Amino acid sequence: MFKQSKLVSALAVAGIALFGASAAQAQIVKIDGSSTVYPITEAVAEEFQKAKKNAIKVTVGISGTGGGFKKFCRGEIDIANASRPILKKEMEACKEAGIEY
């Protein structure tokens, strides 16, 4: 339940941030990572999109926890699904790329 609450919070924050974007920009939240977390993320993403009347599109992919962190640290996605804590080397990759979390 706690993980789901964090995910809902993360989606809400991402949604709020995207509302500040210009109307011409596509409002998309990109999520990728753990297949373990995927079913919960997909369900929350669907409900979030319904709540926002599809004004914000949420994409959810599966590339594994490590793959999700790589994409996150490269700035390719907004949220990394993870079934484990971020590793030190992944933290360093994010820091080197200027990605803050």
Question: Predicted regions span which residues?
Answer:
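Intrinsic disorder/low-complexity segments
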Residues: 6, 19, 31-32
